[in-house]
Amino acid sequence: MASRKVVYRRPLAIDDVTSHSEAISAYSLESAFRFLDALESTLDLLSRFPEAGGVIPVRRKELEGIRAKLVVGFSHFIILYCVEENHIEILRVIRGGQDLHSVSLNAR
């Protein structure tokens, strides 16, 4: 069995998750907890199967090699990440429908 990769979250990704969970909790606290659980389950899946997400077709050089994976059970949220030799780096967690080429990947 392949070893798990460590999952690192960039500050922007942490901010994204906070923002999304707060927005969801305004309608349903239970749904917000389900979102957080689903996100963690998806990150666990990526730690075991890093290539589970598809490579994004790009127009911007800085996006080359970045993968996207839908949050299981919350398919309108997308995890943007890159696979490194010993870890996975979570760059952003965005809402579906956002133009991927306009999403900032720079640290806050």
Locations of regions flagged by a protein language model:
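Residue-level signal for well-ordered alpha-helical positions
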Residues: 20, 49, 103-106
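Enriched for short, Lys/Arg-rich terminal
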Residues: 71-108
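Generic alpha-helical structural context detector
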Residues: 41-44, 92
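Arg/Lys-rich, positively charged N-terminal/basic patches that mediate binding to nucleic acids
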Residues: 1-38, 42
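A short, surface-exposed loop/turn module that caps and links secondary-structure elements
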Residues: 45-72
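Short, hydrophobic secondary-structure boundary micro-motifs
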Residues: 33, 54-58, 102
